[in-house]
Curated annotation (Swiss-Prot):
Protein name: Enolase-phosphatase E1
Catalytic activity: 5-methylsulfanyl-2,3-dioxopentyl phosphate + H2O = 1,2-dihydroxy-5-(methylsulfanyl)pent-1-en-3-one + phosphate
Biochemical pathway: Amino-acid biosynthesis; L-methionine biosynthesis via salvage pathway; L-methionine from S-methyl-5-thio-alpha-D-ribose 1-phosphate: step 3/6; Amino-acid biosynthesis; L-methionine biosynthesis via salvage pathway; L-methionine from S-methyl-5-thio-alpha-D-ribose 1-phosphate: step 4/6
Similarity annotation: Belongs to the HAD-like hydrolase superfamily. MasA/MtnC family.
Cellular localisation: Cytoplasm; Nucleus
Key words of the record: Amino-acid biosynthesis, Cytoplasm, Hydrolase, Magnesium, Metal-binding, Methionine biosynthesis, Nucleus
One example of a Gene Ontology biological process annotation: L-methionine salvage from methylthioadenosine
SUPFAM superfamilies for the chain: HAD-like
Gene Ontology cellular component annotations, sorted alphabetically: cytoplasm; nucleus
Enzyme class: hydrolase
Organism encoding this protein: Salmo salar (Atlantic salmon)
Length: 261
């Protein structure tokens, strides 16, 4: 694919993670299986600790919310109180978490527990954050050219920092000027990008957003943000209309800043 120009008025690049900086398989084949394989072990080891108790409390509150709203819920009781029934209580939590993951839910309770487990795994060297080989050199080049670089992902800010803090390239957190997650809004809503621009202290048209998801690209465009769609192995296939509408890149090295060396 040809070189794609970053408009000369751009002050910041906003990067998606999954399918953009990082193989889409990393979450599906590494992060999520780690939770499934080590969940019961994690709960058993930390059951009496405050952080684990808070995680379970949030899961229980989510169940109560689901019941109140008549949502389907595989597990209607999460009881952490009885020491004699600890094994049963842990099993209930495991069943609930696995059900949420199978249902592709994104609840705060689930993301918090996952984040705590991944934090321990990264710190212990069990997991290293994957990034494409073109990512770090390109970001370094953009920063030398005076651009700021931010992350916007559906994964929590903590999860983002773990991935880049314990990456295969080492700790590269210093390459980023800030992180955004869905606390600022959904990635498919244009208002989210307006809020991000406000938080950055710049105009929407001074931002370029890189993502592999065209619904996100459209939302960003609707907010006045410039967009390039990233085509990586395993990413969702694009329609002919999408291919003709968007600037496409297969590597960050294709992006060139107009008027800067």
């Amino acid at each position: 694919m040809a070189t794609v120009s970053i408009p000369a008025n751009t002050t910041a690049l906003l990067l998606d993670i999954e399918g953009t900086t990082t193989p889409i398989t990393f979450v599906k084949d590494i992060l999520f299986p780690y939770i499934k394989d080590h969940l019961e072990e994690h709960l058993s080891a930390h059951w009496e600790e405050d952080e684990c108790k808070q995680d379970v409390h949030l899961l229980k509150k989510q169940v109560e919310e689901d019941l109140r709203l008549n949502r389907a819920c595989a597990q209607h009781a999460l009881d952490q109180s009885g020491h004699t029934d600890e094994e049963k209580a842990i099993r209930e939590v495991v069943d609930n978490v696995l059900w949420q993951m199978a249902s592709d839910r994104k609840t705060t309770a689930l993301k918090q527990l996952q984040g705590h487990m991944w934090r321990a795994a990264y710190a212990a060297g069990r997991i290293k954050g994957e990034v494409y080989q073109d990512v770090v050199p390109s970001i370094r080049r953009w920063r030398r050219q005076g651009l700021k670089v931010y992350i916007y992902s559906s994964g929590s800010v903590e999860a983002q920092k773990l991935l880049f803090g314990y990456s295969v390239e080492g700790d590269v957190l210093d390459l980023f000027d800030g992180h955004f997650d869905t606390n600022i809004g959904a990635k498919v809503e244009s208002k989210s990008y307006e809020r991000i621009a406000e938080r950055m202290g710049c105009l929407s048209e001074e931002i370029m957003f890189l993502t592999d998801i065209t619904r996100e690209a459209k939302a960003a465009e609707d907010a006045g943000v410039n967009v390039a769609v990233v085509v990586r192995p395993g990413n969702m296939e694009l329609t002919e209309e999408e291919r003709s509408h968007y600037n496409l890149i297969t590597t960050f090295s294709q992006l060139e800043v107009m008027g800067r060396v």
